[in-house]
Amino acid sequence: YHAEGDVNSVIEPHGFLLVDNGGQYDCGTTDITRTYPVGPLTDNERRYYTWVLQSHIDMARAVFLDYCTGFALDTFARGPVWAHKVNYRCGTGHGVGFISGVHEGPQSLRPNNPVIFKPGMTITDEPGIYETDEVGIRIENELECIDLGENQYGHWLGFAPLTLVPISTEPVLVDELSRDPINWLND
């Protein structure tokens, strides 16, 4: 890879740098995104980052019944962003192939996806806010859908992290997060 003249950009000492990274290995495929501050941030950039982080954490910590679809989980993940009447115009996540296409279904976290989640499915958790000529923020990890057991209310599923790459905390407006997400981030 090398940047072409019409698409390369100078990294200016303000705002964010979004790094979408991954690789194909004989033991699997990775897809990770982090957004790093590279200089002073506006209040709006810090708010957006905090809301995206909250969405990301909520998805990673989700506990749900075994009949939930990608559409239901996508809606759940968008809650912290929608609470501020903001939306991200992409899915929250996609299935990940094994030594194949990094975007592979049938599972995904997006509007109108009717696929029911099952243990063993791998998914990305990548909410983001993108405003043309203003800001681009995404935090992406990979998660595995896991079985959390059954009780009188149903069969429960959740997610286990597959990506252990530090998340930048510098931009976070800590006062806008409750104790549980802060604990998750620190753990």
Regions found by a protein language model. Give the residues of each.
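Active-site neighborhoods and metal-handling regions in enzymes and metal-associated proteins
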Residues: Y1-D187
